[in-house]
Amino acid sequence: MSWQDKINAALDARRAADALRRRYPVAQGAGRWLVADDRQYLNFSSNDYLGLSHHPQIIRAWKQSAEQFGVGSGGSGHVSGYSVAHQALEEELAEWLGYSRALLFISGFAANQAVIAAMMAKEDRIVADRLSHASLLEAASLSPSQLRRFVHNDVTHLARLLASPCPGQQMVVTEGVFSMDGDSAPLAEIQQVTQQHNGWLMVDDAHGTGVIGEQGRGSCWLQKVKPELLVVTFGKGFGVSGAAVLCSSTVADYLLQFARHLIYSTSMPPAQAQALRASLAVIRSDEGDARREKLAALITRFRAGVQDLPFTLADSCSAIQPLIVGDNSRALQLAEKLRQQGCWVTAIRPPTVPAGTARLRLTLTAAHEMQDIDRLLEVLHGNG
């Protein structure tokens, strides 16, 4: 089989399964409204959970800092790309979340890959929730360590896997809020079992940070858990992009020596770091509390209105509210129907989710209004 035959076969298989991914160029993709092909849609596909991507205070911070620092960092943080803006953001994140250190990364994917690649050796074992993000599972499968997956949120199964003899160290990996189902991990129970077996816990809280907990401190703070490694990302609750790893000073020093994604990548622009500092200030303020309260009210309104729909509603109190349809083609048809009625919704299909669980992944944000939720419910009930 030639290279072209191999590529064609893979694409044909995706098409046949109604699983071919496509991108749509949009004029505006974050916030309350999505604009595409000169049409405006209510946007129920964005991760901009607090509606901060268009916050004037954050935009102003980026603009002013671009004038001061320029639009790029100029290099890796190990060469010339670590600015006073990066340092200030790291210090503020560490203080906010109760850690000694924070290290910035260009994306959550890079942060997860870097930590696992740097920390895990052949004699070690990773025990991961089987519904963990692709960045975590891919890094675990590519690492030299043994990978074992426990049944989603099943602490008993996790304990059984941890009890199996391991010549090296064990790392338990999970998410705070799961990206496709929107449900939360029982972090306190997971940490207890992990500590009983002398393991370390790594939590990716991409979808909880900024959105839940006191001052938006996220899933771990809410459940009174402090994992050895906490990954937070800035493309969701913060409304910007990038990520950080929170850890002890010793682990931070170790990652600065061995995390190749950090060492060999150009740092985020200093102006971006300043915008993130402005976003963090909003998240921690009374305005941040108000946005979280508004989002919670919108979620409650939505869940009350979909109880009688012929879909499986995930057990989610988060901004991620998937309606599990099952069949790929039906999910695509429903997404298209919603778009025709002015609601932009994305159909998520295997391999992103398990076979037979294709879904409409609806996301709500603090930028929405109650009438937006009512309109979505109207369309879902076939009255649009």
From Swiss-Prot:
Annotated positions binding pyridoxal 5'-phosphate: G108, F109, S179, H207, T233
Signal sequence extent: none
Function, in words: Catalyzes the decarboxylative condensation of pimeloyl-[acyl-carrier protein] and L-alanine to produce 8-amino-7-oxononanoate (AON), [acyl-carrier protein], and carbon dioxide.
Catalytic reactions of this protein: 6-carboxyhexanoyl-[ACP] + L-alanine + H(+) = (8S)-8-amino-7-oxononanoate + holo-[ACP] + CO2
Stated name of the protein: 8-amino-7-oxononanoate synthase
Binding locations of substrate: R21, H133, T352
Top-rank taxon: Bacteria
